[in-house]
Amino acid sequence: MSALNSRTVEEVRKDYAKLLDPQEPLDSRMRELYRLKEDCLKTAAGVTVILETIDTTDSVLLQHELAYNAGQSGREEAVPELERILRTTSYDVVTRHEAAEALGAIGSPLALQVLEAHSDPTTEPEAPIRETCELALARIAMKETKGDAAVAPPSGCEFVSVDPSPAFSALYSSTDEPVPHTVEELEAVLLDTSGRTRLFRRYMAMFTLRNLATEAAVAALCRGLREDNVSALFRHEVAFVLGQLERPSSQPALIAALKDEEEAPMVRHEAAEALGAIADPATLPVLESYATHHEPIVRDSCVVALEMHKYWANFNGLAHQQQQEA
């Protein structure tokens, strides 16, 4: 075992005291989380400190990022605490949703009971949480029946996140559901809000389009963001995927989602973060104008997006300077 992976919880707490400090500004704590993610996310001590941080903040944005990264760790030790968060209705819906998604990402059968309970409309009133649990159950079932490879990113894929569903692949087959291949076929699945297409299958189309990463695929995803009218959870994931792709052509759809006062906050927040990831100076005015928004997760996401803008502007400026000096 490396020295890095053998650090104790106490050592990681000391190294990430700013992350655990409720008095630290949000942007500072977010930077510390990203640093921990690169440093020791997949260790028992790392995920313990991530989970301990959740109850040190009332920022839904930070809570949601912490729960997301707990899921990305793949550590089964995180399951009991994530289950507690999912069950606790005093947490914001976005935080609870992210705990459920994290349970699906970890993929442990230990979580099946709580996921089944919160996928039931008779016990869980919040649609985004029910839908997240539905996706998590489907992902765990696919992992159990088809193996780890069925839910893993394709070989050579640039996107290494553990997603709520896999993309379509040769490992996915069904006599009832043919595998879509073209952008047009994938878009038809993505945009099917009739109820005939399971949400998990729509997600599979989404991640397949992301992996294709063509302009036509991006355009289809933008349509999904703005044309879907049945699932805020789905639209928020499309915005996240567009942030991963970082294509300027997606900015009009993302800006429209951020500005839409009728849109769910969870969607608007992901749209803001996606704009931050793209880091086009042209979007600075809209992010600045929503950085004082009355909805906390929208406001905080715009603040973080502006920090991302600043980082990439400095990074690109340094790279340009080095090219000039070479």
Curated annotation (Swiss-Prot):
Binding site for Fe cation 2: 97-98, 236
Enzyme kind, highest EC tier: oxidoreductase
Pathway terms, separated by semicolons: Protein modification; eIF5A hypusination
Segments annotated as HEAT-like PBS-type repeats: 62-88, 95-124, 201-227, 234-260, 267-293
Residues in coiled coil: none
Binding locations of Fe cation 1: 64, 269-270
One Gene Ontology term of the molecular function aspect: iron ion binding
Catalytic activity: [eIF5A protein]-deoxyhypusine + AH2 + O2 = [eIF5A protein]-hypusine + A + H2O
Alphabetically ordered keywords of this record: Hypusine biosynthesis, Iron, Metal-binding, Monooxygenase, Oxidoreductase, Repeat
Region feature (Required for enzyme activity): 169-179
Free-text cofactor note: Binds 2 Fe(2+) ions per subunit.
Required co-factors: Fe(2+)
GO biological process, one term: hypusine metabolic process
EC numbers, comma separated: 1.14.99.29
InterPro entries recorded: ARM-like (IPR011989), ARM-type_fold (IPR016024), Deoxyhypusine_hydroxylase (IPR027517), HEAT_type_2 (IPR021133), PBS_lyase_HEAT (IPR004155)
Free-text activity regulation comment from the record: Inhibited by metal chelators ciclopirox olamine and mimosine, both of which also significantly inhibit growth. Kojic acid has no effect on activity.
Entry annotated with the keyword Translocase: no
Any single Pfam family the record assigns to this protein: HEAT_2
Function: Catalyzes the hydroxylation of the N(6)-(4-aminobutyl)-L-lysine intermediate produced by deoxyhypusine synthase/DHPS on a critical lysine of the eukaryotic translation initiation factor 5A/eIF-5A. This is the second step of the post-translational modification of that lysine into an unusual amino acid residue named hypusine. Hypusination is unique to mature eIF-5A factor and is essential for its function.
Family affiliation: Belongs to the deoxyhypusine hydroxylase family.
Protein's recorded name: Deoxyhypusine hydroxylase
Source species taxonomy: Eukaryota, Discoba, Euglenozoa, Kinetoplastea, Metakinetoplastina
